[in-house]
């Protein structure tokens, strides 16, 4: 991976991980570091903004397109990241039922 995925930019996803990859808990420290170091290149390859140069990058693009399963660590981390950001956010409510409108029981439809 020395020649593959080279970039001078660090990758941060402030929309989904505003406190950073390592502080969120979805990724191990090693995975978070890999995303920060090479995520910019991963993203450009995935979006087609950058042409793959090495064989490893060509295989990475094939994984992004769904043509093969992730094998390398970089492929697995990027697949895990994409899965995490595409899933719907879970939220919990304090009540178990449907929201009720106050005063709904008091209303009657009569012409009195």
Swiss-Prot record:
The modification N6-acetyllysine is found at residue 15. Residues 103-112 have a biased composition (Acidic residues). The keyword Acetylation applies. GO terms for cellular component: cytosol. Disruption phenotype: Inactivation of the gene affects Ori macrodomain organization and Ori positioning. It removes constraints on DNA mobility in the Ori macrodomain and allows long-range interaction between Ori and Right macrodomains. The keyword Acetylation applies. MaoP belongs to a group of proteins conserved in Enterobacteria that coevolved with the Dam DNA methylase and that includes SeqA, MukBEF and MatP, which are all involved in the control of chromosome conformation and segregation. Belongs to the MaoP family. NCBIfam families: PRK11027.1-1, PRK11027.1-2, PRK11027.1-4. This is Macrodomain Ori protein. It comes from Escherichia coli (strain K12).
């Amino acid at each position: 991976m020395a020649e593959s995925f080279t970039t001078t930019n660090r990758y941060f996803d402030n929309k989904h991980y505003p406190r950073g990859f390592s502080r969120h808990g979805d990724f191990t420290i090693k995975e978070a570091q890999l995303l920060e170091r090479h995520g910019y290149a991963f993203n450009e390859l995935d979006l087609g903004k950058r042409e793959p140069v090495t064989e490893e990058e060509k295989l990475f693009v094939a994984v992004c397109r769904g043509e093969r399963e992730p094998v390398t660590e970089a492929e697995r981390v990027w697949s895990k990241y994409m899965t995490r950001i595409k899933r719907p956010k879970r939220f919990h409510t304090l009540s178990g039922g449907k929201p009720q409108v106050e005063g709904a029981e008091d209303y009657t439809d009569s012409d009195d």
